[in-house]
Every structure is written in C-alpha cells, then in structure tokens.
Design a protein with these regions (language model features):
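Polytopic alpha-helical membrane-helix bundles and their juxtamembrane interface segments
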Residues: 1-10, 18-168
C-alpha cells in the first residue's frame, strides 16, 4: 500500500465515528435534563470542522498547516462546550450521578485521548512524517481508548442507571 488507502479509510472512519462519539454527550444529557437543540448543532459543527479541515489538509486541498490549525480550533470548540458551555453547565446541574460520571470520564477522553489524533496529524504532515505502519498502530490504539472505552463507559452508566431505576 502506498499510504493513501489507510489514510482514506481513516478519514472515512473519523467522518462517521467522531460526530457519533461527540453527539453522545448530547444524548446523555437529553436523557436526564431539558437541553436546547442548539447544543446538538454546535457539537456536530465543531466535530465536522475539525475532521474535514484535517482531511482537506491531509489531501492537499488546503495548506497542511491551515488544516491542522482549523482542526485544532474545532476540537477546542468542542472541549470548550463540554467544560464551559451549555453541555458542561447542563452536566453540572443534572441530578444523575451516573450521567455525571460518564460525562466526566468521557470528557477526559475527548480532551486527552483525542489529542493523539492531532499529534499524529502533526507528525505525519508537519514534522517530516513517520512510518505509516507506526502511525496506523498509534491510531488503532487511540481508537481503542477513544471509541471502545468511551462506549463502555456509556454502557456502564446506562446499566447502573437501569439497575438503580429497577430498585426504586
């Protein structure tokens, strides 16, 4: 492989899974509190700005540096929404411990774990590159943390919430 196929597949994956992952915050909060639909759109747009900018940079449709910077802005916008925006405030004021725990843990994954994707982009496109196989291993390990563990946290919170609801 020339490196293009893994990159293309990676971005197809990210265009599908990153918005779903980020929108999980909206779904969690919507299940326990009254929130406005605008949060959904802000999270979706922030995620798409991030992924599409870096895709365009990776494929040369825009400057690699600009793709990196715009992608970082999209990611930071999401983080801002989760910590200081409506999502963060809704989580802080909701009365569901399991949602608050899942929100907190998954917000850390978005903050720390998703930085791996930006570091990989930087290494691959701005720092002279790296072995494509090494990058694929790093991205696959990041996917385990950022997608599978993220999902397991949601599942665990929902399971505990269901058990608690059945006891009342």
């Amino acid at each position: 492989m020339n490196g293009q196929a893994p990159t293309a597949l990676r971005y197809i994956d990210w265009l599908l899974t990153f918005p779903l992952t980020i929108l999980t915050f909206y779904v969690m909060l919507k299940s326990v509190t009254d929130i406005k639909r605008g949060m959904f759109w802000r999270l979706l747009v922030g995620t798409l700005v991030w992924v599409i900018a870096q895709l365009l940079g990776a494929y040369g449709y825009m400057s690699v540096t600009l793709g990196f910077l715009v992608g970082i802005v999209g990611w930071l916008y999401i983080i801002g929404e989760l910590y200081m925006g409506d999502a963060g405030r809704a989580n802080a004021s909701c009365n569901n411990e399991r949602v608050q725990m899942a929100f907190f843990a998954n917000r850390l994954i978005i903050t720390i774990g998703f930085s791996i994707y930006h570091i990989g982009y930087f290494i691959e496109h701005l720092a002279g590159g790296a072995n494509i196989n090494s990058l694929n291993i790093i991205y696959n390990l990041a996917d385990v943390l950022n997608k599978i563990i993220f999902g397991m946290i949601i599942y665990s919170a929902a399971l505990e919430d269901t058990k608690k609801g059945n006891q009342n």
